[in-house]
């Protein structure tokens, strides 16, 4: 299936989902890619530690502004990528129409992506590497 509109979701939309969003945008500039948070920290920039992770690989996340997940974003998406099984379950229960197009970013590895929020830079670095690997795993499916 060819996806045209991808939505990446985490909790606050300041750490994991923006990193995945910007990696996907770099790999697929022809697609529409957004991110949002279940409990979005609306109006916040990406976490400085997440921005540093992306800067190290040549990606500027400074334009990112966090937003809260809503039904309209979910309806527009052909593919919804979440960070954990709990997030997938929450979305599918709250918005049943999202079932069948909501998957974990770590689906192909059977992994959840741990939340680095309020952890040290080393934890962010590990999370960033896992996100990069998981984004690469989606390549043959997007």
UniProtKB/Swiss-Prot annotation:
UniProt effect for mutating residue 10 to S: Loss of activity
Reactions the enzyme catalyzes: O-phospho-L-tyrosyl-[protein] + H2O = L-tyrosyl-[protein] + phosphate
Activity modulation notes: Inhibited by ammonium molybdate, sodium orthovanadate, N-ethylmaleimide and iodoacetic acid.
SUPFAM superfamilies per the UniProt record, alphabetical: Phosphotyrosine protein phosphatases I
GO biological process, one term: polysaccharide biosynthetic process
Pathway: Glycan metabolism; exopolysaccharide biosynthesis
Molecular function in Gene Ontology: protein tyrosine phosphatase activity
Claim: Transmembrane is one of the keywords in the record: no
Active site annotation, chain numbering: 10 (nucleophile), 16, 115 (proton donor)
CDD domains to which the protein is assigned, alphabetical: LMWPTP
UniProt keyword annotation of Hydrolase present: yes
Matching SMART domains: LMWPc
Record's keyword terms, sorted: Exopolysaccharide synthesis, Hydrolase, Protein phosphatase
EC number: 3.1.3.48
InterPro entries with a match to the protein in the record: LMW_PTPase, Ptyr_pPase, Ptyr_pPase_sf, Tyr_phospatase_low_mol_wt
Segments passing through the bilayer: none
Family that this chain belongs to: Belongs to the low molecular weight phosphotyrosine protein phosphatase family.
Function: Dephosphorylates ptk. May be involved in the production and the transport of exopolysaccharides.
Protein name, as recorded: Low molecular weight protein-tyrosine-phosphatase Ptp
Lineage of the species this protein comes from: Bacteria, Pseudomonadati, Pseudomonadota, Gammaproteobacteria, Moraxellales
């Amino acid at each position: 299936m060819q996806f045209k509109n991808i939505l990446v979701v985490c909790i606050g939309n300041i750490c994991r989902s923006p990193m995945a969003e910007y990696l996907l945008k770099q790999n697929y500039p022809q697609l529409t890619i957004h991110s949002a948070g279940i409990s979005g920290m609306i109006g916040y920039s990406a976490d400085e530690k997440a921005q540093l992770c992306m800067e190290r690989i040549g990606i500027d996340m400074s334009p990112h502004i966090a937003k809260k997940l809503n039904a309209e974003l979910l309806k527009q998406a052909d593919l919804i990528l979440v960070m954990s099984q709990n997030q997938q379950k929450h979305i599918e229960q709250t918005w049943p129409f999202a079932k069948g197009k909501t998957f974990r970013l770590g689906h192909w590895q059977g992994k959840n992506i741990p939340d680095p929020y309020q952890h040290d830079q080393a934890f962010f670095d590990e999370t960033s590497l896992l996100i990069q690997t998981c984004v690469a795993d989606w390549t043959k499916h997007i």
